[in-house]
Curated annotation (Swiss-Prot):
Organism of provenance: Psittacid herpesvirus 1 (isolate Amazon parrot/-/97-0001/1997)
Key words, A-Z: Disulfide bond, Host Golgi apparatus, Host membrane, Membrane, Signal, Transmembrane, Transmembrane helix, Viral envelope protein, Virion
Assembly behavior: Interacts (via N-terminus) with gM (via N-terminus). The gM-gN heterodimer forms the gCII complex.
Role this protein plays: Envelope glycoprotein necessary for proper maturation of gM and modulation of its membrane fusion activity. Also plays a critical role in virion morphogenesis.
Membrane topology: Single-pass type I membrane protein
GO cellular component, one term: membrane
Listed name of the protein: Envelope glycoprotein N
Signal peptide boundaries: 1-27
Main location: virion
């Protein structure tokens, strides 16, 4: 059972950190009022090229009821740093587990083969 090895426990710890960091990032954004794609809650704070600066086009582009609340890449907050660090830890853990499985499989096949 490769889940019981140290690499598996690192993967489980990384998943727990990621699960804890997810709600923290969402609550930090809601507290800061970051609701639209440009990183602010107000209308007409920033306009994309080609977009009109009137409220009618803003309402068509952005609705607070059906918009996703993802991580803004332009605003560096502590919550997004924690999220991306935990995401990197999960990726490293997955690569380590896959490498460990492939290495053990190769080692077992070489030992079991007859020369």
């Amino acid at each position: 059972m490769w889940l019981l090895r140290p690499a598996g426990s690192n993967f489980i710890v990384a998943l727990i950190v990621l699960a804890c960091a997810g709600p923290l990032t969402c609550s930090a954004q809601l507290d800061a009022g970051i609701l639209n794609p440009w990183g602010s809650a107000g209308h007409n704070d920033a306009v994309m090229p080609g977009m009109f600066a009137n409220s009618e086009s803003d309402e068509r582009f952005y609705s607070p009821h059906c918009s996703s609340r993802g991580l803004p890449l332009v605003n560096e907050s502590m919550a997004s740093v924690i999220f991306f660090l935990s995401l990197a830890m999960v990726c490293v853990a997955i690569v380590a587990i896959l490498y460990n499985c492939c290495f053990n499989s190769f080692k077992n096949s070489v030992i079991n083969s007859r020369w």
